[in-house]
């Protein structure tokens, strides 16, 4: 279930429910496709929201830099969202787990352990 979303210039960062907490995933605004390489799972909702906001702010900042747009507000937003994420992450002890690593862990634990007796 989608809980919240934060939009950058080309991507939307969605916070969804996940069995292990809250998943932040990246969706292309033009095509609606998910980027399978970008996903992070957080144990706490506030940190997941802060991460989505920070990711969107960073994308807006990077796009403005590439387009040579001078806008102090974009830089201010990035700094504020980054400070908020770092503060919440530190206070709640939640730095997130890469979604690809979590999938690999789930696949490994789902396989039975082969025991060999000599």
Feature names for model-found ranges:
Residues 26-28, 59:
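Short regulatory "switch" loops immediately downstream of catalytic or recognition motifs
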Residues 45, 71-72, 81:
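Alpha-helix boundary/capping motif
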Residues 1-26, 54, 75-117:
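Short N-terminal "domain-start" leader segments
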Residues 53-67:
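Short arginine-rich
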Residues 29-50:
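A short, exposed loop/beta-hairpin motif centered on an aromatic-Gly-Thr core
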Residues 11, 20, 40, 47-49, ...:
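Intrinsically disordered, low-complexity segments enriched in small/polar residues
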Residues 62, 69-71, 77-78:
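A C-terminal-region feature
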